[in-house]
Regions:
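Bacterial N-terminal signal peptides
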Residues: 1-11
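N-terminal beta-rich core of secreted/periplasmic extracellular enzymes
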Residues: 16-193
Length: 193
């Protein structure tokens, strides 16, 4: 009953999204950094150890760390909150090349998920929905980090994981502690599907 009430309440506040053109399916660029079997992440024209998928992981990590500046290492320990929070732009643009994340960023959380604030309607940004357009936009963000930063380290794109996903048209469930208090294994199993 609680889950039904939550689903109905969530749909009452939802707005109908405007139709938008979905960009063509993400296709890798013709950037010369892409080779058969490996990617030249640092764009130096040779396969470094960290770029070699057949090299032992410990060697790859050591090689990458040896090439990183203090600024790049620091940025890999940072989570940047996405569009409408810290990020003012939904997609990479020229200003990103001089922003803090020009050296990469460890993670971007809740980027383009449509959530603005409890009690407010979802963001009307066209890159939130439909899901195919959202995927395209997230791929464009990753393209910036891979193709536009010195070492090409992808960012970890994350979203609220405690209650499912904090995103437009997604179902939010109570926290694990709240679900556990139901003592209803069948209900918990259905939440997981």
């Amino acid at each position: 009953l609680l889950l039904t009430a939550m689903a109905v309440a969530g749909s009452l506040g939802a707005q109908t999204a405007k139709p938008v053109r979905v960009p063509d399916t993400y296709k890798p660029s013709n950037n010369p950094m892409y080779h058969k079997g490996w990617i030249d992440f640092n764009k130096n024209g040779k396969k470094d150890v960290y770029e070699d998928p057949t090299a032992p992981i410990a060697d790859r990590v050591e090689d990458l760390l040896s090439q990183m500046t203090v600024e790049e290492k620091t940025c890999q320990m940072v989570t940047l909150y996405g569009y409408g929070r810290v990020l003012k732009d939904d997609l990479p643009n020229e200003s990103w090349k001089s922003a803090l994340w020009k050296d990469g960023i460890g993670a971007i959380d809740e980027h383009l998920n449509g959530f603005r604030q409890w009690g407010l309607p979802p963001s009307d940004n066209p890159n939130v929905w439909p899901a195919s357009r959202h995927a395209w936009a997230i791929n464009e963000v990753q393209r910036f980090f891979i193709e536009g930063t010195r070492l090409g380290i992808p960012s970890d794109i994350t979203n609220e994981g405690i209650r499912g996903v904090e995103a437009y048209r997604a179902t939010n469930f109570p926290t694990g502690l709240g679900l556990g208090h139901t003592w209803d294994r069948d209900l918990i199993r259905r939440v997981g599907y």
